[in-house]
Amino acid sequence: MRPHFLGFLFVMFSLTGFTQSIKFLSADQINPELLNSHWKAQWITHPSESVLDYGVFHFRKNFRLEHVPDEFIIHISADNRYRLFVNGNAVCFGPARGDLAHWFYDSIDIAQFLKSGENVLAAVVWNFGDDKAWAQFTIKTALIVQGNSAAEDIINTNGSWKVIKDQAYQPASLDAREVLRTFIVVGPCDRVDAAKYPWKWESTDFDDKTWSQAKTIDAGHVRGVGSDINWVLTPRRIPAMEQNEQRFAAVRRTSAGSAAASFIQAPEGFLLGKEKWIIPANQKLTVLFDQGNLTTAYPELLISKGKGSRINLIYAESLVDSKGSKGNRNDIENKEIKGYADQFFPDGGSGRLFRPLWFRTWRYLQMEIETGHEALILDDFKSDFSAYPLKENAVFETDQPELKQIWDTGWRTARLCANETYFDCPYYEQLQYVGDTRIQALISLYVSGDDRLVRNALLNYDESRFYEGLTQSRYPSESPQVIPPFSLYWIDMVHDYWTLRDDPEFIQAFLPGIDQVLNWFIQRIDPQTGLLGKTEYWNFVDWANEWDWDPKQRIGGVPKGGSDDGQSSILTMQLAYAVQRAAELNDYFDRPVQAQKYKLLARDLTQATYKNCWDQSKAYLADTPEKNEFSVHAQIFGVLTNTIPENEQQKMIERIRTDRHLIQPTLYFRFYLTQAMKKTGLADKYLETLGPWNEMLSAGLSTFAEKQDPTRSDCHAWSASPNYDFLATVAGIRPASPGFKTIRMEPAFGNLNYIKGQMPHPSGMIVFDLKKNGEHGLSGEVVLPDDVTGTFIWREQSVLLNGKTIINF
């Protein structure tokens, strides 16, 4: 993979440029003409500067209103991204990440920011060229703004807009990959020279006479109109990102050129924003801030004076010792910070606010200051938390407080890995991978109930399909990557959504794509063995220790049979697992021929796997017919697909939980182990498997890691699966029919004495309060939404659920 980057830069504006809370409008509020014809507005750019290379540009449009209208709806987009100001007020940023055939625009009513008389729309637009993030598509630097009707056409982008390139910005931290010695594709940080910045450029009284007239490129176009398929303007599918002010928990360490320096300690009220911190001229100061928890946020540094100073901000998930080990994340002794960094050069002005247009990820943030001939005043330092606005609508309470810690930490992990798309991790990649997303989507639906980001992800992957029929493994991504098993997980995601949401039209549209994915695999089945033969690309399954990184092929996590001549039992059963779900979908949507085809295919795949890979002496499924490698993964999918006879499945799961001779699953694949435990009646053992999560908490992690130490990423939402399983396994709430129209609730208490909580359902809230009575008894109540019924099961006894039901076994 080649290192392309998306840079993050800092927009500087006066204190009046604070962030406003605003909601994007939905597609049904858009003028229908704009959905079905070319826009009057033109894409615009700078007339002479390079529009392909790194650059930051400011655009302005002055206009006059005789009176303030009740509504003033505009639609805005940019390449790469924009931040919009109206009369000096920061209004919104975007567009949401998509691809060239789905270039999203934002629809907003800006009437609340307008005034009678002179008004100005101002937008900063940036393009990071070759340094852009891998998740960012681009054509060239451009902006488009379209009024919703004739009343708003006055602000349409055309040659009347003005533009200037901002010379204050240069990319920084281009060596982050080498510094951290790992894969990073979120782009460079920013070197900002405040003396070159056009202060107050976003305000109405700014003089833009020296700015250039914008150059027009082409009219905005929508899908199906004309022949163009780039910058296809598409209404935003997700809400605005949440933004909330947050402050640092502590200053953990300071050092200065002179240990006795009086300024070395932060003033008592500084972290609360109540006192300034003055750094004298010609001094050096290093300050280590601790957020207390990992966060994704826009740091906001407010300073005055300090001309000739230099400020570095270094961001890290954790500190490391001399050997590169993270150890306990709370400990800082004999540890240093390594991470990407921003650089600021103050101009001596007052009230200068430095804020990135894209967020940073950190728990620890180190500020390094070197002042020049003028003292530097730190007026304030805080941050603006930003993530997808998932609400924690579910509640899960028990008599074991450590489960509350796992719940809270898992939810933080899920939140930091959800933005304009789901992220695998917020620090290193910010890419949406199918294997991660399946778990993240279930967490979102069970804990929040918000399905918009889930729907967006399902569409993203369907839109990623390339000519061979497979979906890409991650999307949006300007660097294409193919992991064939992830195309299968996309099918599983569609099936998950079908069981949890009553949206048949949305689901049915994916069936042709499912057929394409499965046809790709069918063509690669070995007719001699019935197993999957050689399958191209990266057949990732899990980051198991035995499945090492292959530097020649540049792949890892691949089981035996996944990267040579095929015959992998795991990959074959993953195919069978997806085919079984495809058969159910085709049955439901009245495609009997296709459904029967998939049922027979699933039968053939499982029979071939058992015939070729079952080792009678070991009583395990081998990873290949050679029977010289055995993994927990193969047994898990042997159970999930019924490749292993049903009467042997429970015994199998009991064995693999303790047999360390097998290749072991990481945090990611333990999600599938849990599903196998549920299937075999061993859900009561689930809480016994949470040791790795408790170990992470003991190591001071505030989010769950990519894998157990040593790990690259401290925040990976595929490891937040307990937030789903506390509700789906411990509380035992699962759909009993498509669309979640009926439920099945079979709690698995393990060693708990009571569980209490609630879970969002499309029709309302499922509420439960249950307590064990002695060894076998259970009492309490379950409340379902009005139009939902279900079955409650306890130790082979059952009762119908309807409205409020008293439980007494």
What is each model feature region?
Residues 186-188, 192, 429, 447, ...:
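C-terminal capping/lid segments that line or modulate ligand- or cofactor-binding pockets
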Residues 156-166, 172, 364, 372-409, ...:
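Active-site acid/base region of carbohydrate-active enzymes
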Residues 175-200, 265, 600, 607, ...:
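Non-catalytic C-terminal accessory modules of carbohydrate-active enzymes
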Residues 1-23:
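Bacterial Sec-dependent N-terminal signal peptides
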Residues 21-427, 436, 452-453, 457, ...:
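Extracellular/oxidizing-compartment recognition motifs
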Residues 298-317, 365-368, 434-464, 494-501, ...:
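Alpha-helical support elements that line or immediately flank enzyme active sites
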Residues 491, 498, 576, 582-583, ...:
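Heptad-repeat amphipathic alpha-helical coiled-coil interaction surface used
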Residues 79, 360, 428-436, 449, ...:
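Aromatic- and histidine-enriched alpha-helix N-cap/loop-to-helix transition segments
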